[in-house]
């Protein structure tokens, strides 16, 4: 009888140990599936949206791209949600002159634009894909707790994720959350690795130019850099005392050739945790 009890206890302890070991794997798989579903819903939503005609909305069609917006990788003049696009462009244009004075911890949590005011009804505003880090996560406007628990969060008072000259879209993500691995893979990235940013209109391709560990209360590096098209992604370190940051840049077109601006930047962390 005693031996049976000991065997039963051993089996229970073994199963409990296996559960503890396997839970992060299970939780990560569940979170990844939820993120895939959110991305699929985003793609279906924008695929079924209809671009307005020139007669119904002349603003939607342009012969030349805005100077503040990088050339479209889809090379299309017609855009769905043209008023939302124009709002994003306008916000990015005025940001360099107001970003530092408008900065506060609270401003980072608020969306820079309320997309629903322009007819956008999806929660996600896009998604980020980083093959080398095994990351593909939906993106939400405003780096508040609710958004960060669901995927990547675009900091308020940083550029809207449409690219262009003098922009710096800054994305925060949990390293892990409730046992699931989220943005921990950022630590795998090396200079030159590809990062793809998909917004409601197109997919923009960036490449890593630097990685660095920084203090959480520095703010300079989330600021726009004049003339540059930047994407900054960060997560917390373990333990949660620093921020691991990855800065990326889009190609700069010069005539028929494409060159890289490999200037290394100073870095900053958001106070968000």
Placement of each model-derived feature along the sequence:
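Solvent-exposed, non-transmembrane regions of membrane-associated and secreted proteins
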Residues: 7-273
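Positively charged n-region of N-terminal signal peptides that target proteins for export
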Residues: 1-4
């Amino acid at each position: 009888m005693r031996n049976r009890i000991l065997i039963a206890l051993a089996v229970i302890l073994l199963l409990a140990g296996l559960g503890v070991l396997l839970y992060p794997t299970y939780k990560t798989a569940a979170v990844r599936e939820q993120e895939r579903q959110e991305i699929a819903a985003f793609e279906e939503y924008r695929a079924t949206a209809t671009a307005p005609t020139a007669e119904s909305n002349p603003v939607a069609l342009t012969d030349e791209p805005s100077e503040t917006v990088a050339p479209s990788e889809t090379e299309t003049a017609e855009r769905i949600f043209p008023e939302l696009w124009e709002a994003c462009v306008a916000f990015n244009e005025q940001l360099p002159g107001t970003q530092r004075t408008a900065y506060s911890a609270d401003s980072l949590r608020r969306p820079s634009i309320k997309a629903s005011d322009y007819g956008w009804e999806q929660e996600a505003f896009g998604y980020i894909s980083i093959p080398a880090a095994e990351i593909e996560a939906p993106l939400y406007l405003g780096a508040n707790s609710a958004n960060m628990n669901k995927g990547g969060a675009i900091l308020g008072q940083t550029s809207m994720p449409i690219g262009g000259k003098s922009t710096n879209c800054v994305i925060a993500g949990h390293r892990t959350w409730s046992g699931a691995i989220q943005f921990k893979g950022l630590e795998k990235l090396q200079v030159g690795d590809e990062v793809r940013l998909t917004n409601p209109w197109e997919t923009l391709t960036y490449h890593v130019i630097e990685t660095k560990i920084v203090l959480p209360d520095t703010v300079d590096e989330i600021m726009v850099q004049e003339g540059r098209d930047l994407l900054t992604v960060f997560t917390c370190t373990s333990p949660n005392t620093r921020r691991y940051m990855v800065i990326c840049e889009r190609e700069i077109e010069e005539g028929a050739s494409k060159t890289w601006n490999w200037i290394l930047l100073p870095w900053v962390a958001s106070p968000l945790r």
